[in-house]
Amino acid sequence: MASKSSCDLLLAAVLVSIFAAVAAVGSEDCTPWTATPITPLPSCRDYVEQQACRIETPGPPYLAKQQCCGELANIPQQCRCQALRFFMGRKSRPDQSGLMELPGCPREVQMDFVRILVTPGFCNLTTVHNTPYCLAMDEWQWNRQFCSS
């Protein structure tokens, strides 16, 4: 029969391996989608302007949605919420946003639309939460976010 210390050591080893496996699953590197010098999600900018600001963009209306949803679908599930936060940008740094202040369509209106891009009525894409929703999309929540960053 194994001694108590051997059983404790085995239990500790099992727990460490479980925690390591869980950490590896949730540690997708989202840097490529949040550290780019170019405007993130360029097709989504057109789609947001169409839907939130009623601005006509080049091409048929469905094309902007199709391209935006395609760009979002190409981002790993674990990184979609973080990429949308990066696209929205901080209010204090509008120059680092994919959104522009437009006459009659402030960034806040556009940000409200960005928050729902992954939902069933729009792109219907799962996120880090295994649902088509992003939690903690208000800037004051970003430091306490549920998505990895």
From Swiss-Prot:
Gene Ontology molecular function, alphabetical: alpha-amylase inhibitor activity; serine-type endopeptidase inhibitor activity
Sugar attachment sites: 124
Main subcellular localisation: secreted
Matches recorded under Pfam families: Tryp_alpha_amyl
PTM annotation, UniProt: Five disulfide bonds, which are essential for the inhibitor activity, are probably present. Exists both in a glycosylated and in an unglycosylated form. The glycosylated form is a potent allergen.
Residues spanning the signal sequence: 1-24
Keywords carried by this UniProt record: Allergen, Alpha-amylase inhibitor, Disulfide bond, Glycoprotein, Protease inhibitor, Secreted, Serine protease inhibitor, Signal
Presence of keyword Signal: yes
Tissue-level expression: Endosperm.
Localization, UniProt: Secreted
Segments traversing the membrane: none
An example Gene Ontology CC term for this record: extracellular region
Glycoprotein is among the record's keywords: yes
SMART domains in alphabetical order: AAI
Annotated InterPro entries: Allergen/soft/tryp_amyl_inhib, Allergen/tryp_amyl_inhib_CS, Bifun_inhib/LTP/seed_sf, Bifunc_inhib/LTP/seed_store
Function comment: Part of a complex with inhibitory activity, but CMb is inactive as a separate subunit.
Subunit organization: Heterotetramer of one CMa, one CMb and two CMd chains.
Family, similarity comment: Belongs to the protease inhibitor I6 (cereal trypsin/alpha-amylase inhibitor) family.
Full protein name: Alpha-amylase/trypsin inhibitor CMb
Originating species: Hordeum vulgare
Gene: IAT2
